[in-house]
């Protein structure tokens, strides 16, 4: 069965490479599919089930709306490429329920989470080849007591991972029997824990480089991915204490093959590696902040120009920021109808303050006798 899946993937991949070389359009065999097609919905269901099974903590995701779908097929199998929005549910990760038995979390983020998935389907086998859901800014929640000694998830694009990844890859290259050095391919998951220093736990995969160990004692800027693709995925634990000026301790366990595609991971931006500079994320955040500020000013101006919008009584609950689109607007019924209606909690307006009770009006002036209680 696994052999059939590999052959199907190989055929589709070969067609993708063969098409442009023959002067044809890229991926000519990939065609649009109906968003409300039963097979497309089944592909999304498989992707969400697989994604939720791999969540280490938090809450499961459920389908909100299928945005776009396409498929590529041959005589033996069909691959579906789907884009959809999801929402956080009230079912915890690792529970017995599947997402179809859950409800949207009322306190979840109003903005849905965009997801992409690639699913292989044939008469004899169904398999999720890749699924990824882009995280969105978490809603503000009540403060909880901080666990100072517990592992904390950190962003896979954080600069703090540069040294732990470098130690891990260096350790692998020193211990492996490969004739070539390996370089970073993608990072899947990372946590940091305060111990006698910092303990990093990493999930990542690497790719063989063009630098042989005979010609290069260690990795350098001349090392690039080798055309002969060879991958290895690793779990690494790195203990560092920079203030003690001690050599970091890295425990790396690796196996051949890529990191599972359905695990939550991001591929590094082009040009990033432990040996290269990071992108200027601060500049991006500054740009986003200025854009948000401009939107707020524009919103305030529009409210001043239309006072009727402010005085409207009993407003309806706010809809999601990505409003559902009717299927009739697209010939392929995309986006699809929402799986369930999401109604975020409404913020009650504070009661209008009561005007202070007016003091009694004294027509005649007070005398000293009045203050003494004498008439």
Swiss-Prot record:
<dbReference type="InterPro" id="IPR050735">
    <property type="entry name" value="Kininogen_Fetuin_HRG"/>
</dbReference>
<feature type="disulfide bond">
    <location>
        <begin position="234"/>
        <end position="254"/>
    </location>
</feature>
<keyword id="KW-0926">Vacuole</keyword>
<dbReference type="GO" id="GO:0004869">
    <property type="term" value="F:cysteine-type endopeptidase inhibitor activity"/>
</dbReference>
<feature type="region of interest" description="Disordered">
    <location>
        <begin position="283"/>
        <end position="375"/>
    </location>
</feature>
<keyword id="KW-0165">Cleavage on pair of basic residues</keyword>
<dbReference type="GO" id="GO:0007204">
    <property type="term" value="P:positive regulation of cytosolic calcium ion concentration"/>
</dbReference>
<dbReference type="Pfam" id="PF00031">
    <property type="entry name" value="Cystatin"/>
</dbReference>
<feature type="disulfide bond">
    <location>
        <begin position="115"/>
        <end position="133"/>
    </location>
</feature>
<feature type="glycosylation site" description="N-linked (GlcNAc) asparagine">
    <location>
        <position position="235"/>
    </location>
</feature>
<feature type="disulfide bond">
    <location>
        <begin position="211"/>
        <end position="223"/>
    </location>
</feature>
<feature type="disulfide bond">
    <location>
        <begin position="91"/>
        <end position="102"/>
    </location>
</feature>
<dbReference type="GO" id="GO:0072562">
    <property type="term" value="C:blood microparticle"/>
</dbReference>
<keyword id="KW-0325">Glycoprotein</keyword>
<protein>
    <recommendedName>
        <fullName>Kininogen</fullName>
    </recommendedName>
</protein>
<keyword id="KW-0732">Signal</keyword>
<dbReference type="GO" id="GO:0005773">
    <property type="term" value="C:vacuole"/>
</dbReference>
<keyword id="KW-0963">Cytoplasm</keyword>
<feature type="domain" description="Cystatin kininogen-type 1">
    <location>
        <begin position="35"/>
        <end position="139"/>
    </location>
</feature>
<keyword id="KW-0646">Protease inhibitor</keyword>
<feature type="signal peptide">
    <location>
        <begin position="1"/>
        <end position="23"/>
    </location>
</feature>
<dbReference type="GO" id="GO:0005737">
    <property type="term" value="C:cytoplasm"/>
</dbReference>
<dbReference type="GO" id="GO:0030195">
    <property type="term" value="P:negative regulation of blood coagulation"/>
</dbReference>
<feature type="glycosylation site" description="N-linked (GlcNAc) asparagine">
    <location>
        <position position="74"/>
    </location>
</feature>
<keyword id="KW-1015">Disulfide bond</keyword>
<dbReference type="InterPro" id="IPR000010">
    <property type="entry name" value="Cystatin_dom"/>
</dbReference>
<keyword id="KW-0789">Thiol protease inhibitor</keyword>
<comment type="function">
    <text>Inhibits papain and ficin (cysteine proteinases) but not trypsin (a serine proteinase).</text>
</comment>
<feature type="domain" description="Cystatin kininogen-type 2">
    <location>
        <begin position="156"/>
        <end position="260"/>
    </location>
</feature>
<dbReference type="InterPro" id="IPR046350">
    <property type="entry name" value="Cystatin_sf"/>
</dbReference>
<dbReference type="InterPro" id="IPR027358">
    <property type="entry name" value="Kininogen-type_cystatin_dom"/>
</dbReference>
